[in-house]
């Protein structure tokens, strides 16, 4: 792991696009990953990655030092399923991206 956040994010994007029906796009102006139904499941935000996670992965990600619920407006209205995971835990970003992909792809919307 390089601790270069953008490089780490780009590596996750490359792997996800190569191994799953994933595209890159934008959400709230940030680069993100979307499944083949257009549902965003991960993104790059201010040198971190954010992930939309189900309960087990959500709790695991939130337990990391520096992790928190994603509040893009910074007005105390976090997106409860989304977790910010700092680059210090970038070695887990791909794993969480896979979990997030599975979560949004399997979730009945």
Q: Predicted regions span which residues?
A:
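Charge-dense, helix-prone N-terminal extensions
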Residues: 1-109
């Amino acid at each position: 792991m390089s601790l270069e956040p953008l490089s780490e994010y780009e590596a996750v994007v490359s792997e996800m696009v190569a191994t799953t029906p994933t595209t890159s796009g934008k959400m709230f102006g940030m680069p993100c990953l979307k499944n083949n139904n257009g549902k965003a499941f991960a993104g790059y935000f201010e040198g971190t990655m954010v992930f939309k996670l189900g309960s087990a992965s959500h709790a695991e990600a939130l337990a990391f030092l520096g992790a928190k619920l994603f509040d893009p407006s910074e007005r105390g209205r976090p997106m409860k399923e989304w977790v910010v995971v700092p680059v210090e835990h970038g070695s887990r970003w791909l794993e969480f991206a896979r979990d997030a992909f599975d979560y949004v792809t399997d979730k009945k919307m």
